[in-house]
Amino acid sequence: MHSRFPRPVAHLELHTADLPSAREFYSELLGWRPELIEAAERSYLALDLGEGPSGGIVECGTDRALWLPYVSVPDIVSATERAKELGASILLEPREGPAGWRSVVRAPDGGEVAFWQPKASVPLDAA
């Protein structure tokens, strides 16, 4: 699955237990203006990061805040299975949302990465 061009990061998300503190810090530090989106499960701050990937801050029961990159893949099931073959544990099986599918894996070294497959998109190798 090696390619001349790496898969692009499509979305960057901060997972935190303290949404108000994260909102204030990143707004002051980077000039981001998060937009609150109330979801059934939890509060979410959508971030406009300018050109490049989108972003968000999600409130969840984490011991420490962590940034989770969402990497664009052409086939979410294959990418998730390949990660498992390479020793990753699956934290979130491929799951459909309004705009696409996502999954989350933890690498053998403990790092986490999410895979993202949009519902409608230009093929990644067409760009």
What kind of region is each of these model predictions?
Residues 1-23, 67-69, 116-127:
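N-terminal beta-strand motif that seeds the catalytic metal site of vicinal oxygen chelate
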Residues 22-26, 83, 110:
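Conserved active-site tyrosine of GNAT-family acetyltransferases
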Residues 46-62, 69-72, 81, 91-92, ...:
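Conserved, structured core segments of small domains
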Residues 95, 101-104, 111:
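Glycine-rich beta-strand-turn "strand-cap" elements at beta-sheet edges
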